[in-house]
Amino acid sequence: MLYYLFNYLDQLDFPGAGMFKYVSFRSGLALILSLFISTAIGRRIIDKLQMLQIGETVRNLGLEGQMSKKGTPTMGGIIIIIAILIPTLLCAKLNNIYVILMLVTTVWLGALGFADDYIKVFKKNKEGMHGRFKIVGQVGLGLIVGLVLFMSPDVVIKENMEVRHDNVIEEVRYHTVETKSTKTTIPFLKNNNFDYANLVNWAGDYKEEAAWLVFVLMVIFVVTAVSNGANMTDGLDGLAAGTSAIIGVALGILAYMSSHFEFASFLNIMFIPGAEELVVYAAAFIGATVGFLWYNSYPAQVFMGDTGSLTLGGIIAVFAIIIRKELLIPILCGIFLVENISVMLQVAYFKYTKKKYGEGRRIFKMAPLHHHFQKPGNAGIQALIQKPFNVVPESKIVVRFWLIGIILAVMTIVTLKMR
């Protein structure tokens, strides 16, 4: 909104109004605003949650310090959502299709997570919303995002087209054209590109339509997987928020580079017109998650709940899809991936051993993985992996996961220069 106001003032030669033309200025402003909003309103929202007795119900799983968390206000993801929406609405171009998609994603998954937390807190149902309804909500968002990227004329990439002139001396010229494409970015392949159309060569005359169908299905899968991965990661104070902030920095850098022809050419990635506005959103996202850590770091004064975790995961997924970096998610979101896989392996192995031996056995002392480090080894738990034998303090687990997240974020960007 402020962009349009200051654009009008700039036409009237108002001093300083032209600063709002620059994405860097608006991104910096969005970062500062989101930090201020999340810290300023955070305390008030926490007090309100306490007054309404919206506290976390904790099952005794035998984890160190676990029961002390009982009654800590939950649904704090509201703080993150507000701190993202307000700066984005104020600083970004609201007619940008990518910004619109990110705003829809934030509200959509925020509402889904809020409904889940509401059932847990007010209906006294620890399981919350039935899993199938969560999946329907996530799939619905993925379908909307995929179809918009397919149908909107504003969603294009720019590619160099080679034009040859057969004169006495062969002349080759390149010019840039906007095109709809099912290409995405992946390292180690030629030009760092992969086209989903290559998966449907059998489709003949319907190859283009089949490629977009594969792309939409991929969008649905990524949104569902990453939002659930973030949800799994939200088990220790500051873990999900800090990890998401790190991922947000990497995505912001990738969006900036994808929106500038020189940087895109340097990294050999797709040039995406309009993606520069996503840098403003990324700045608000980073500020909101870092500001939330003010209250969520150990010992947490508030938990984000599914209101926050589902939203953070969905935002990361849709953002990566928009800038065509979804195939980098296994590296960038490696923490989410490992947390998710640890649960799937634990459940699958438990069921297999129960069927084969009559009793369920474990791979980890406890899943998701971060809880494995909170359990002592050789404490009567039949698990394939017993190390570490000593309990690792919660704050140390979180910081170590953050450090791994930073390494993965750097690796994600560096891999784009590998040939």
Swiss-Prot record:
Localization in the cell: Cell inner membrane
Membrane topology qualifier: Multi-pass membrane protein
Main location group: membrane
Keyword terms of this UniProt record: Cell cycle, Cell division, Cell inner membrane, Cell membrane, Cell shape, Cell wall biogenesis/degradation, Magnesium, Membrane, Metal-binding, Peptidoglycan synthesis, Transferase, Transmembrane, Transmembrane helix
Pathway listed: Cell wall biogenesis; peptidoglycan biosynthesis
PROSITE patterns membership: MRAY_1, MRAY_2
GO molecular function: metal ion binding; phospho-N-acetylmuramoyl-pentapeptide-transferase activity; UDP-N-acetylmuramoyl-L-alanyl-D-glutamyl-meso-2,6-diaminopimelyl-D-alanyl-D-alanine:undecaprenyl-phosphate transferase activity
Catalytic reaction list: UDP-N-acetyl-alpha-D-muramoyl-L-alanyl-gamma-D-glutamyl-meso-2,6-diaminopimeloyl-D-alanyl-D-alanine + di-trans,octa-cis-undecaprenyl phosphate = di-trans,octa-cis-undecaprenyl diphospho-N-acetyl-alpha-D-muramoyl-L-alanyl-D-glutamyl-meso-2,6-diaminopimeloyl-D-alanyl-D-alanine + UMP
Entry-linked Pfam families: Glycos_transf_4, MraY_sig1
Similarity comment: family membership: Belongs to the glycosyltransferase 4 family. MraY subfamily.
Entry protein name: Phospho-N-acetylmuramoyl-pentapeptide-transferase
Organism name: Parabacteroides distasonis (strain ATCC 8503 / DSM 20701 / CIP 104284 / JCM 5825 / NCTC 11152)
